[in-house]
């Protein structure tokens, strides 16, 4: 399974790990993904999403119905 937020599309980034001696090696920055269940009143059921913290804030701001409509318009849910 990909480490990608289902709402925002955020995924891993590549950067440098920098030591005290300023040696640089490649590393991955992973998004803060969490599994969350949301009650969808219009469908009378639970929806389980793997979302980042930014996606959770987006759902708090706009509501789960708006976010689900956007996901379905993109063909992801």
UniProtKB/Swiss-Prot annotation:
GO CC terms in record: cytosolic large ribosomal subunit
Keyword Ribosomal protein: yes
GO BP, one annotated term: translation
One MF term in the entry's GO annotations: structural constituent of ribosome
Keywords: Ribonucleoprotein, Ribosomal protein
Pfam families: Ribosomal_L28 (PF00830)
Cross-referenced PANTHER family: 39S RIBOSOMAL PROTEIN L28, MITOCHONDRIAL (PTHR13528), LARGE RIBOSOMAL SUBUNIT PROTEIN BL28M (PTHR13528:SF2)
Family membership: Belongs to the bacterial ribosomal protein bL28 family.
HAMAP family in alphabetical order: Ribosomal_bL28
Protein name as catalogued: Large ribosomal subunit protein bL28
